From Swiss-Prot:
GO CC term (a single one): Golgi apparatus
Subunit structure: Interacts with YIPF5.
Recorded name of the encoding gene: YIF1A
Segments crossing the lipid bilayer: 139-159, 175-195, 204-226, 230-249, 272-292
Residue list for modification Phosphoserine: S12
Protein name as it appears in the record: Protein YIF1A
Membrane topology, as annotated: Multi-pass membrane protein
Amino acid sequence: MAYHSGYGAHGSKHRARAAPDPPPLFDDTSGGYSSQPGGYPATGADVAFSVNHLLGDPMANVAMAYGSSIASHGKDMVHKELHRFVSVSKLKYFFAVDTAYVAKKLGLLVFPYTHQNWEVQYSRDAPLPPRQDLNAPDLYIPTMAFITYVLLAGMALGIQKRFSPEVLGLCASTALVWVVMEVLALLLGLYLATVRSDLSTFHLLAYSGYKYVGMILSVLTGLLFGSDGYYVALAWTSSALMYFIVRSLRTAALGPDSMGGPVPRQRLQLYLTLGAAAFQPLIIYWLTFHLVR
């Protein structure tokens, strides 16, 4: 009996194994795919094969090596030209700021009328960095203010349903072009007036870039309170920036050696400083009026 029961169990196992699979409900149309569970293609294997084939291609390897060498050579050339035309140590001076300096400088730009001493402080014939001297110009605030202005302009255009990448790019490029033109005009004016001072291109770029702070406040006030608030903020920030520019550039632009010079030259240098200050409200208005409606 045990023999027959065992034989029956063994035979049932063979019959279970030999039982045909039920016919599929649908015909297999995935002729181009490999036989994976569920009928999905072997994407991992195909990608691995493609990558291995690409890496094994001699032409691809040559192209990758050539592109890498060009990128490395271009990077070296950029660093070389940057060190040639721009002193990195001098550039670091204009970014030597801290949180306390940024807060105080922003307050000085908005309300400069109570500030008394406007002379740049020196230590061993070298100017102190901005974080140690509130009167020292910096490029950190102008850079961050420019980025904030571009973002705020995009938000203002989006609120007015006028946003597009082209319009935002035009706003950013126009703001940069105006600052560059202003710096070039100041350099030309200083050259024609034969002014000997410690002002460099970085100094002029910093003083010209401080207008972005007033532009941000004007646009933000206009978005919150309408056109009336915009014009009030524009008048306040423009007058504050004009006062700041005149007091900051007066000693540096006139130069200590020009005090005993001819009177016409002193007047020309003074007119140059006043002209640079008077030009600020026009630029602020031109770059912000279309953002507030």
